[in-house]
C-alpha cells in the first residue's frame, strides 16, 4: 500500500477500536441483522442500462485529501434529492456517500440524511478493513459497500463480501490494475469498479478503465470511477463499452448537482 493508504488504514483501525468500545460487535451485528429492507443497488444500475441510459452512481462528498474542501454549501439531503430528480429525464441510479471523517470530512449521518431524502439505493464510500464496518454499514442504512482491493487481502474481501450479501447489501469491489482485477474476479459480486485514480500517486487517467475493459467478463457490471469530468470523457468510456459511472467532484462543484449530472450524461 502507498503511504496515504497506510495512513488511512491505520486511522480506520483506531476508529474501529473506539467504535467497538461504544457498541460491541455483537450489538452492532444484531442491529444490522434487524434491518431487513435494503434497496436493490445492482438492480437500479441494470435498470438504467436496460433503458439505454447511463447508470450513474452520484457521489456526495464534501472534501478529499487531494483537493481539500470541494463543496462549502454541503447539505446531503438536498444533494440527494437533486441527484434523484436530475432534469426529469436523466437522473442518478444510485448514490455514493463518503462517511470517512478524517480524510474526506464525511460522517455516517450524511448517509442517513441522504438516504432518508430519496428512494435511491446508497453505497457507503469508506475504507473497509474490518468485519465490524460491514455490520456498521447496514446498521446506518447502507444498501451497498465498497471493497478496495488495494487495502485488502483476498480472504478479507471474500469475508466482507459474504457478510454484505448475508445482510442484503451489494458489494462493489474497486481495482486499479490488472493484478487487482484478477483478484476481484474471484469474488461472487458482479459489481467491479475500475478507479482511474491511482491511490498511490493520485494521478488520473481514463486509459485505466479503457485498457482493463476487455479483461472484464460480460456477466460483470463494470463501473468507471474518477476523472469523469466532461461529455468527451463520457464518450470515451461509452465507446469502450462502459455504461456505469461513479462521479462526484464534477457534480459537487456545481450549484445544482442534479442538473450537472443531467448535462454531463445528456
Curated annotation (Swiss-Prot):
EC number(s) given by UniProt: 4.1.1.48
Domain of life: Bacteria
GO biological process: L-tryptophan biosynthetic process
GO molecular function, a single term: phosphoribosylanthranilate isomerase activity
CDD domains hit by this protein: IGPS
Recorded catalytic activity of this chain's protein: 1-(2-carboxyphenylamino)-1-deoxy-D-ribulose 5-phosphate + H(+) = (1S,2R)-1-C-(indol-3-yl)glycerol 3-phosphate + CO2 + H2O
Known pathway: Amino-acid biosynthesis; L-tryptophan biosynthesis; L-tryptophan from chorismate: step 4/5
InterPro entries on file: Aldolase_TIM, Indole-3-glycerol_P_synth, Indole-3-glycerol_P_synth_dom, Indole-3-GlycerolPSynthase_CS, RibuloseP-bd_barrel
Similarity comment text for this entry: Belongs to the TrpC family.
Protein name: Indole-3-glycerol phosphate synthase
